[in-house]
Amino acid sequence: MQAPPSFYEGDTLEVAKKLLGQKLVHIVDGIKRSGIIVEVEAYKGPDDKAAHSYGGRRTDRTEVMFGAPGHAYVYLIYGMYHCFNVITAPVGTPQGVLIRALEPVDGIEEIKLARYNKTDITKAQYKNLTNGPGKLCRALGITLEERGVSLQSDTLHIELVPEEEHISSQYKITAGPRINIDYAEEAVHYPWRFYYEGHPFVSKK
């Protein structure tokens, strides 16, 4: 079942934690690629100095952050790696959750090809398929084309995992500082990164 629009409403930190254990799905050329979300970071603009929308900054890139919750915010870092975010909070409040790592589930062969141009890969390469925001976007075929797409779409959405299959019974959620935001002054220390402690696909322990 797809997460309904109401899933993305409410406090961004709570939505971030709710996303853990759910499945991010992208249909590419009719083939489902997906992974269980195991690591996220919350960004609470306009007061969060780590957020692109800090100070209410509106640009062509950040405009989608000011829109309705439950949409995709995709951007490039270093001019080459895509990052996928889920927009949260009411219209006009530019907040979102960065998906940092997944455990691959569906379309594994397509994911391997997208990452390594081959399907015969080592154990180390398998562990590196989706353990970072740029890696998971490449694996799932998420690009700037998906920016602003509603997560009620047939081709890009969050699939709710039934309680009996949910990995929350196996892993404890841990909170800590976000990664690679050294510019963000006091926001560097906010414990707004949430992840499953000990999960092999988490990007950084």
From Swiss-Prot:
Protein's GO biological process: base-excision repair
Broad EC category: hydrolase
GO molecular function: alkylbase DNA N-glycosylase activity; DNA binding
Pfam families: Pur_DNA_glyco
Superkingdom assignment: Bacteria
Enzyme Commission number(s): 3.2.2.-
Keywords annotated in UniProt: DNA damage, DNA repair, Hydrolase
HAMAP family reported for this sequence: 3MGH
Family named by the database record: Belongs to the DNA glycosylase MPG family.
NCBIfam families associated with the record: 3mg, PRK00802.1-1, PRK00802.1-3
Protein name in the entry: Putative 3-methyladenine DNA glycosylase
